[in-house]
Amino acid sequence: MTALLIDGNALSKTLRAQAAERAAALTARGHQPGLAVILVGANPASEVYVRNKIKACEDNGFFSLKDAYPATLSEADLLARIDELNRDPKIHGILVQLPLPAHIDSHKVIEAIAPEKDVDGFHVANAGALMTGKPLFRPCTPYGVMKMFEAHGIALQGANAVVIGRSNIVGKPMAMMLLDAGATVTICHSKTRDLAAHTREADIVVAAVGKRNILTADMVKPGATVIDVGMNRDDAGKLCGDVDFAGAKEVAGYITPVPGGVGPMTITMLLINTIESAERAAAAA
């Protein structure tokens, strides 16, 4: 058996076209969706992510604003800028690129963003709303994974799902979304005693820890769906995920590649969240 590839680029293209249509409709009514992205410091990876987000906005009819600050920016000044953006009616989404310099409390910064503009879905109010099954925004990466399941008709109700990783950005919200869809969910992490015992029983495995080959072919149930959220480099410097792709694709039923799998979906769902925020603002105007 060779797994069917879940192509994040193709699905992302379709969803971005839909987002562009919604953006055009809003703009025609005088409510162009707007996203503000804040970058503090000169982290090369963060600069690439921010550039990709801004380009996605420009390509799909969104207004975008990039604030780039030196790593010496004070926490107080960053919080003051967020307050300004909270009150700016042209801005429907505010994103602070993580990680932040050590002297800035990222939790305090995230909580400073107005929940109705927290398009990353990280604010405690939005995390709590997700927990209760009534989310205002869903964190972009797990939201994108759910869209992948939907697009490929992968049944979640009654499925055994394992999420490897417990971060607030991917692991925990991914588990909640799967649970809300009717899956039986197990969260595994660095303290899990026998990871393979869990994954071999799973119909769905989502690997999201940032560790190469955390999931190998012998750990995959035949026909399972394997979602690789990891972003790593192999010994040759080539981009790879958390899954041993070459081995796992011979056992799994569906699998996402790296690159070209989950990655493109993350920015796409950021656009979708921003559109939803703009539509709510327009309806309330």
From Swiss-Prot:
GO terms for molecular function: methenyltetrahydrofolate cyclohydrolase activity; methylenetetrahydrofolate dehydrogenase (NADP+) activity. It catalyses: (6R)-5,10-methylene-5,6,7,8-tetrahydrofolate + NADP(+) = (6R)-5,10-methenyltetrahydrofolate + NADPH; (6R)-5,10-methenyltetrahydrofolate + H2O = (6R)-10-formyltetrahydrofolate + H(+). Pathway: One-carbon metabolism; tetrahydrofolate interconversion. It comes from the Bacteria. It holds the Pfam family THF_DHG_CYH_C. Coiled coil: none annotated. NADP(+) binds at G165, R166, S167, S190. Disulfide bonds: none annotated. SUPFAM superfamilies: Aminoacid dehydrogenase-like, N-terminal domain, NAD(P)-binding Rossmann-fold domains. One of its GO terms (cellular component) is cytosol. Homodimer. Belongs to the tetrahydrofolate dehydrogenase/cyclohydrolase family. Catalyzes the oxidation of 5,10-methylenetetrahydrofolate to 5,10-methenyltetrahydrofolate and then the hydrolysis of 5,10-methenyltetrahydrofolate to 10-formyltetrahydrofolate. This is Bifunctional protein FolD. It comes from Burkholderia orbicola (strain AU 1054).
